[in-house]
Design a protein with these regions (language model features):
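Short, well-structured secondary-structure segments
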Residues: 1, 196-199
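Conserved SAM-binding loop
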Residues: 24
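Conserved catalytic core of two-metal-ion nucleotidyltransferases
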Residues: 28-82, 98-191, 198-228
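A short, surface-exposed interaction/processing loop segment used at functional sites
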Residues: 88-96
Length: 228
């Protein structure tokens, strides 16, 4: 219904359960075309997870945002997890200010320092697991919560009761179907208000540096992929 345009954002963000993310990473481990990259972003701060082509000349990507599945009171779990995100950010700011991460704001996961950040994340998840009940079983899950390594929301879009999200429905986009939560309209309105309007700050976004799009090798890679 959008004529192949997503008017409420200028990139593609996809929620994915933590179990599905692990499965995707396993599937793509030896894939020659695609892979999943991980970069720790100091500015936000967050764990930037992207589905990308292995061709480094092709700058296109899809952002992946992990969701955790939980049982019990989903509203309470949402509030507890939201506070856990605040605590996690405070902790990593305290521990890593003045380190390589601050000096090199985009830190790839093959860095020794990234291992330390992952350790801190694991510590916070262990503490969180004592307060809410995580599950990998979507059949028994009562809700979803955003991973504490995700970017901050401008305002809270939750809680996420499972029936609003699962099972997914197919929605047509261009010439293919994509899975979407049954309550998709509710959450787009929560986040963006009138999501059919172009965001007022759209010109300030630059997910891909413009100089890439002037590079002949980049343009050739994009054309090759689109025509493949």
């Amino acid at each position: 219904i959008y004529n192949d345009i997503i008017p409420w954002d200028d990139d593609v963000d996809v929620f994915i359960t933590r179990k599905q993310l692990a499965e995707l990473q396993q599937i793509l481990q030896d894939d020659e075309t695609f892979h999943v990259t991980v970069v720790w972003d100091w500015y936000v701060p967050c764990k930037q997870i992207r589905f990308k082509l292995r061709d480094e000349k092709n700058p296109t990507f899809i952002d992946l945002f992990p969701l955790d599945t939980i049982t019990g009171n989903y509203s309470e779990a949402w509030n507890i997890t939201s506070q856990a995100r605040v605590d996690f950010v405070s902790d990593i700011r305290k521990k890593f200010t003045g380190t390589e991460w601050e000096k090199t704001p985009y830190l790839y996961d093959n860095s020794a320092l990234a291992e330390q950040i992952e350790y801190v994340l694991d510590e916070h998840y262990r503490a969180l697991s004592e307060k809410i009940n995580f599950t990998d079983d979507l059949q028994t899950a009562s809700g979803l919560v955003r991973g504490i390594e995700n970017i901050d929301e401008t305002h809270s879009s939750g809680p996420y009761p499972i029936d609003d999200w699962m099972p997914t429905i197919n929605m047509r986009f261009d010439d293919f179907d994509v899975p979407a939560p049954p309550a998709w309209r509710k959450y787009l309105q929560n986040l963006y208000g009138d999501f059919l309007q172009i965001p007022h700050d759209i010109d300030s976004h630059e997910h891909v540096d413009n100089h890439y799009l002037q590079d002949d090798a980049v343009l050739a890679s994009l054309e090759k992929y689109v025509n493949s």
